[in-house]
Amino acid sequence: MCFVRTIAFGATLGLACAATQATAQEKSFKEAIIGPWIITAVFDEYQNGEKKDNWGGPVKGQITFGRTGRFTQIIVGPAVASMKSDDPRKPDAPVVAYYGSYTVDEAGKKVIGKVESASYSPRANTESIWTVQGSGDKLTLIGSPRKDQHGTFTPKLEVRRP
């Protein structure tokens, strides 16, 4: 009788552990993106299919999605000699930095950011939408179309977990 109880207890424990493991693996889209992401590459894809590195070399940066619906993003390109100054408040490299609040579209795997302030002032008080591709520790964030001196482009950020 004790043997039967031991087997029944073991089977119940095994099922409980399996159910807990399955629940832990089934994260929502929002839960999966929360936290810091290191930016490993950035490129802009123009309407004609051309891909450009408008940064002049490798970038460094991070985007963070907080549990409370807040986000920050900063991308810093390589230093440019002509941008150097003695004022530490003036960057000597291309910089894109902004922050604000965000919501998610679970079904569409999209992040909708409401930019509150930015290093490029016309971006303040605008909406930015990223479609997210990939899973796990590596993602690609595809931004909403923008315009620059070369035309309309879609920014793409490749990110990984730290």
What are these regions (language model features)?
Residues 1-11:
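Bacterial N-terminal signal peptides that target proteins for export
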Residues 12, 20-162:
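Lipid interaction determinants
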